[in-house]
Amino acid sequence: MKRIALGVQYDGSVFCGWQSQPHGNTVQDELERALREFAQTPVQTIVAGRTDTGVHGLGQVVHFDTELDRADVSWVRGTNSFLPKTISVQWAKPMPDEFHARFSAFERTYYYVLYVHPVRSPMLAARAGWVHAALDVDAMQAAAAHLIGEHDFSAFRSSQCQSKTPVKHLYQIDVRQQGDFIHFRFRANAFLHHMVRNLMGCLVYIGRGRRPVEWMAEVLASRDREFAAPTFMPDGLYLAQVGYPEQFAVPAPQTGSVPWSTVWTEQAQT
């Protein structure tokens, strides 16, 4: 039995999230159907992070076990030939038995793309969040500083969250404006259900001046979801990258087809 890892990208706007559902309109259902067609045998996948309805995948990682012997490029091209245009396998790589797409991961990175303009753009529908009024980027960055570190993030946790603990370690939140867009980057060991969208809701409240910077610390300390802002829209949220130990040599996400994804790589080079 061989263990194969795949890098997967998808447009989350047309799916009811990642996880398999009875109606079948999920990314997992489509991917496993394509793998079954290509491999001519049922394939069960394990995913790094189960994204919600409307959330996109740039750097999603899955693994599965199979007895078939196929070249890496065959897994990519063969599976893609059975996938809809809204899902694409970017790479395939054999892995040792100890690799696990979910449990071997030590960090996840999400991007949120927010369009700031008086009028919404149909060209960005389901690709970016939208607010009509200017936001204070410096205030949002200052508020984000209150969240860095290991904390109980219950105030940013949905009622449907199945995580065993609300305690997560948030390593980084960056906020950067580029023209009419504000780009957010969130990096943590793991995230709770709706955590990034709930963080976004609070950051936007502060950016609008509806709450002071210090309010973010109060929300965190409250551990009360009702004390925080409403959950923000999923449209601009992307699972950007999953971090693994170097021993597994997991390929970096192929993000060149998404122009705004260079915001953070350009920042790293300056």
UniProtKB/Swiss-Prot annotation:
Classification via InterPro entries: PsdUridine_synth_cat_dom_sf, PsdUridine_synth_TruA, PsdUridine_synth_TruA_a/b_dom, PsdUridine_synth_TruA_C, TruA/RsuA/RluB/E/F_N
Family matches, as CDD domains: PseudoU_synth_EcTruA (cd02570)
Coiled coil residues, start to end: none
Annotated binding of substrate, by residue: Y110
Active site: D52
EC number: 5.4.99.12
Reactions catalysed: uridine(38/39/40) in tRNA = pseudouridine(38/39/40) in tRNA
UniProtKB keywords: Isomerase, tRNA processing
Pfam families assigned to the protein according to its UniProt record, in alphabetical order: PseudoU_synth_1
Molecular function terms, GO-annotated: RNA binding; tRNA pseudouridine(38-40) synthase activity
GO BP terms in the entry: tRNA pseudouridine synthesis
UniProt keyword Isomerase present: yes
Alphabetical list of Gene3D superfamilies matching this protein: Pseudouridine synthase I, catalytic domain, C-terminal subdomain, Pseudouridine synthase I, catalytic domain, N-terminal subdomain
Family designation: Belongs to the tRNA pseudouridine synthase TruA family.
HAMAP family according to UniProt: TruA (MF_00171)
Subunit structure: Homodimer.
Its job: Formation of pseudouridine at positions 38, 39 and 40 in the anticodon stem and loop of transfer RNAs.
Protein name: tRNA pseudouridine synthase A
Species this protein is from: Paraburkholderia xenovorans (strain LB400)
Lineage: Bacteria, Pseudomonadati, Pseudomonadota, Betaproteobacteria, Burkholderiales
